[in-house]
Amino acid sequence: RLKKTVLIIALLISALGAFAQTKSWTADNGNGTFTNPLMYDEFSDPDILRVGDDYYLVGTTMHTVPGLVILHSRDLVNWENVAYCFDRFDFDDDAFSLKNGKEIYGQGIWAPCIRYHDGKFYIYSNVNGKGLQCFVSDKIEGPWKHINMEGRIYDLSVLFDDDGKIYAIHGYGEVKCTELKPDMSGPIEETERVIIPEGSAVGEGHHIYKIDGMYYLVSTDYAPNGRTLCSRSKSIWGPYETCVITADETFGYHASPMTKIRGRIMPDGYPVSITPPDPDKVNASNIHQGGIVSTPDGQWWALLMMDFHSLGRTVTLAPVTWKDGWPMLGLEGNLGRSPRTWLKPNTPYRDTEVPHAPYDRSDNFDGKTLARVWQWNHNPDDKMWSLTGGKLRLRTMPADQLMWARNTLTQRAIGPESITTVELDVKNLKDGDVCGLGNINVPCSWAGIVKDGKTLTLRWFEQLDNDTIDTPVTLPDNRIWLRFVGDFDNDKGHYAYSLDGKEFHQLGREMTLSYQLITFQGARMSLFAFNKLGKNGGYAEFDNFTVEEPKADRTGYIPFDKTFRIINVATGLPMHATPHGLMHDTAADNDSPQTRFRVIDRGNGKVILQCADGRYVFSSGFGLPGDVRLTNDINLAEEFMWQDYLNREFMLMSMRNHRYIGKSPTTGSPYSMDYTGADPARRNGAVLRWEE
């Protein structure tokens, strides 16, 4: 994919950055279907709640504030950021404010649980070293009352039971149940009991429900790959029986590149490396931790996260099919696997909700308050920043490097590809000031301006190789435009700069992007300003922050009105409609009408596949090799749900048996319609590519 990545980046760098609320990724395809992920950016440890016709989703925010992000939806597909639980950590501890060499990267607030009871919303979560926290509000928008419940209860789920008791389920491996006090002042003493013993293959990330008198506990395990389990019992105290309800669904994405470093936030120059991903490995790239929810008409859905390369963990939506009393993920003909693209949930707002993204990512800083998309890296010093004259002003404070710079403003990087640009005014910098656009991660990177005495230097820095490139620069009006170009599906990115906001030049080399367990977050686009000489300095002003997403508009990716060949990604060979009536592969140079196809739109994301010789593809049986046939009768044509990868790669899922069309790269058998899905490397024969 290297040549493809280079071409993508060459095209992206030529884009112009004018401020506008450009189209941003939404899972809603606008035709009655959705495509995972729900958000093409980070939203980890999701917990889902329905109140009437409204759905609420809460997620981990770790060390960034405002903390505990809350999204709202009316159709489970289109989400809007409506609130956070708190503006800043209120603990008297320097680590929460990145002060005096202390930090809480990846150890802030995480794994929340959201509940609604007697007219009040409750959100529970853990803070490392501080214990269990509870936030209570009459309205989802807040204000939220904070109660420090303390106690070692984490990765929990809470159930308000019919008898008035409140239970917290928690623990890893050995699962425990503890009763909580009604006033949320803490756990009830001596009520903790083990309900699932170690050795039951149950992990963490619990979500407890009571459905038709039965207790269901949805959890995840990482031994060795992420997967989702369900435990059920007639009593909250057990005994529980356990069943795996989904495993190995990666949608064709392999494990992430991972950072290796001894220690945490180490000085620049400390050895850092990135382990390349094994394309055949799953690790935690499959859908795993999350919860389930019902619609008013009785449908059930799961919202689970997956480790999504350098973007971090993101959320997926999967249909739930009840089988023998178990909430299995997936469709009737393919239980345990989930479609990347499927019909939207049957909610009252399914057909009326306008597709939209959770956030407005671009910002010209003209407002009186920061947009909700922004989060500070640790608690900010509110005396050292402001929104002034339509610009974000960051005053510099002492720091040795980006990861220790206070008042760094961040937002989640967005995939699959994005171009982040900001205008920077440096006229009020002082000696030793450093400011610019960066990626808060381990390893981190940045591009910006350094002031030494009266000299301004354009600097590119990458922590992975401790590499610095300095470029002397003259800024007649003290302005420069900085840009980050990210290809997050391929974990590549680079910086660029412009002196006029129009013509951009690459700065530094292309970088490998990774995920890691130090910040426990994916890539974060960051606006920063600090002083490297150990003192307070001047200030930098940022304006016209834009995020462009070239692949957010997916309307042109299904090749309607085209005639094309279909190449099997695993074999590299074209699909061939044989005279015998089967689908097979053929020589690479075969360009006969029997190797050319067209797709016909049947509405709601469904298509049929027609060969250029007039025949239609269908399955004559259960989908085994040899069942995929050709017919002249359009009424027999198989309806497929097109599953697109936004790069001409796709899969075709039968609407009849919920399996995928594919061909083994090793056995020599003809095409079948019995594939459960793609493997992480997309080499099992189920992933196809179209070419004109």
Each model region followed by its residue ranges:
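Bacterial N-terminal signal peptides that target proteins for export
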Residues: R1-L7
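Alpha-helical interaction segments
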Residues: I9, D45-P46, V69, C134, ...
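Hydrophobic h-region of N-terminal signal peptides that target proteins for export
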Residues: L11-F19
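Lectin-like carbohydrate-binding module/patch detector with strong preference for beta-trefoil
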Residues: T555-E692
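Short hydrophobic interaction/assembly module
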Residues: S14, F86-D92, G614-V617
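A residue-level detector for conformationally permissive "hinge/kink" positions
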Residues: L7-L12, C230, G290, D382, ...
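Carbohydrate-active catalytic/glycan-binding domains of CAZyme proteins
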Residues: A20-Y557, Q594-R598, A637-M641
